[in-house]
UniProtKB/Swiss-Prot annotation:
It comes from Synechococcus sp. (strain CC9605). Keywords: Cobalamin biosynthesis, Glutamine amidotransferase. Catalyzes amidations at positions B, D, E, and G on adenosylcobyrinic A,C-diamide. NH(2) groups are provided by glutamine, and one molecule of ATP is hydrogenolyzed for each amidation. Pathway: Cofactor biosynthesis; adenosylcobalamin biosynthesis. This is Cobyric acid synthase. Belongs to the CobB/CobQ family. CobQ subfamily. InterPro entries: Class_I_gatase-like, CobQ/CobB/MinD/ParA_Nub-bd_dom, CobQ_GATase1, CobQ_synth, GATase_3, P-loop_NTPase. GO terms for biological process: cobalamin biosynthetic process.
Length: 498
């Protein structure tokens, strides 16, 4: 840490899901408003919700969002260690944006602690060299006081001590037990760590803040740590970071013009692709787990998958595959993204075992598009800018993040000027089956609106206006609303002390 840099800030949480990611994003946007250059950083993240930076490096989507909040383009130095769970007690390990191996849970800290700490220090050095006057805004992971893991901690208090960061402890009051969470966390800190905690933040409080005044006084009297703020319930501003948290989301809209079903398969990844649809007031998303009925939605989306063959097997075993075939044959529209597109094809082959299955295998797909996919070679990681051809001619941007090569039958219509990036086929009653490798396709406002208007036409509804903005504009508005609430409800002065 250079002497010219302002003191780093760190957002810790009493548990997973406490709201660390959003509070870190809020801090980044508030500092940007005050003329500071915030530098978001999470040493190690575990997530299958990923982003690809301009140099082809892979990082967690939550750090990309924090970069946008800070007015920066995301770069993988902001998240130098990314673990991508594969569902079998193993994770793909990403260091500096590139895949470096597969780790088993029981051996991770034995085999990967030293390389991970080296990658974290390298990421910090790269950020500080590029922005020497910037202020690091760090996000912790889970709880900082998991006693069995403290000796090998990579991203919480080890990092806070290393950088002498001023720490804010966030606790989620919505889930109950907030006093025990806070007191328990503070009591488990080691003496050298306790002075790093400069304040407590109560998150997701419902009702008038005055109702928590007695709780604030009790916490300050019994812990000696000031409560710097009480943030109101803002959970619907952004979708959750963890796919498990999708199970807790309840529909917030009443009657809408359209309903789109999204298959929440066991190895769901990159569900941030659905954020633009979450923001569309004219529709609602209904997440479907294996075993639940498909119903009669206006469209079905198969998102990305970390384990495509296993998710396809899950669909077959619970009858969801047969339901989807019948739905498409009856005139239902289907959109598959990345692994979802691969499942829509005729066959999937994994001769090198890249999918992590017990044996190299081939498997029949859903047969809704004439595609043959082979998992081989290296992972494709790149940002893309291309010309869309269907359902309208419009510029498209996004990124590729996948293993595998997909070959279409001759005559299948390409989705864009890159004939290997996606395809579409017409179905009965004006429906369509669409598949693409382009993550972020729905972020493109004109494309999204044209696709939704085709669904509306199937329903006999009037089209929506053809002047939609890209989702980045809506996301920026939400970040401003988040920062507005943070500035209103949180006293930052103790946290910003040198």
């Amino acid at each position: 840490m250079t002497g010219a840099s302002p003191r780093p800030l760190m957002v810790l949480g009493t548990s997973s899901g406490a709201g660390k990611s959003l509070m870190t994003a809020a801090l980044c946007r508030v500092l940007q408003r005050r003329g500071e250059q915030a530098l978001p950083f999470k040493g190690q993240n575990m997530s299958n919700n990923a982003w690809v930076d301009a140099d082809g490096g892979e990082m967690a989507y939550s750090q990309a969002m924090q970069a946008w909040a800070a007015g920066l383009e995301p770069c993988c130095s902001m998240n130098p260690v990314l673990l991508k769970p594969r569902g079998d007690s193993t994770s793909e390990v990403i260091h500096g944006g590139q895949s470096v191996g597969i780790a088993r849970a029981e051996h991770y800290y034995r085999d990967w602690f030293r390389p991970g700490w080296k990658a974290i220090r390298t990421g910090l050095m790269q950020l500080q060299q590029q922005w020497p006057q910037g202020r690091l805004v760090l996000e912790g992971a889970g709880s900082p006081v998991e006693v069995n893991l403290q000796r090998r901690d990579l991203t919480n208090l080890r990092l806070a001590q290393y950088l002498r960061a001023n720490c804010l402890l966030v606790a989620d009051i919505e889930r109950g037990g907030v006093f025990a969470q806070i007191v328990g966390t503070l009591s488990l800190l080691r003496p050298v760590e306790s002075p790093l905690i400069k304040g407590i933040l109560i998150n997701r409080f419902r009702g008038r803040r005055e109702l928590f005044d007695e709780g604030r006084r009790w916490l300050e009297a019994n812990t000696g740590v000031p409560v710097l703020g009480v943030m109101p319930w803002l959970n619907e501003l952004f979708p959750p970071e963890d796919s498990l948290d999708l199970l807790e989301r309840k529909p917030t809209r009443g009657a809408t013009d359209l309903e789109i079903a999204v298959l929440r398969l066991p190895s769901l990844s990159n569900f941030s692709d659905l954020d633009p649809l979450e923001a569309e007031a004219s529709l609602r998303l209904r997440w479907i787990q294996p075993g639940e009925p498909l119903g009669e939605p206006d469209a079905v989306i198969l998102p990305g998958s970390k384990q495509t063959l296993r998710d396809l097997e899950a669909m077959n075993s619970c009858g969801l595959a047969d339901q989807l075939r019948a739905y498409a044959q009856a005139g239902g529209s289907v959109l598959g993204i990345c692994g979802g597109m691969q499942m829509l094809g005729r066959s999937l082959s994994d001769p090198e075992g890249l999918e992590g299955t017990d044996q190299r295998c081939s498997q029949n797909g859903l047969g809704l598009l004439p595609l043959e996919t082979t998992f081989s070679g290296t992972k494709r990681l790149s940002q893309r800018s291309i010309d869309g051809l269907w359902p309208m001619e419009t510029p498209l941007s996004g990124f590729e993040l996948h293993y595998g090569t997909t070959i279409p039958d001759a005559g299948l219509q390409p989705l864009s000027s890159d004939p290997g990036l996606g395809w579409w086929a017409p179905g009965p009653k004006g429906s369509s089956v669409v598949g693409t490798y382009l993550h972020g396709l729905l972020d493109n406002g004109p494309w999204r609106r044209a696709w939704l208007n085709r669904l509306r036409e199937q329903r006999g509804l009037q089209p929506l206006a053809n002047d939609p903005k890209n989702h980045s504009a809506h996301r920026d508005l939400l970040l401003d609303r988040l920062a507005d609430a943070f500035e209103q409800h949180v006293n930052l002065a103790p946290l910003l002390q040198p």
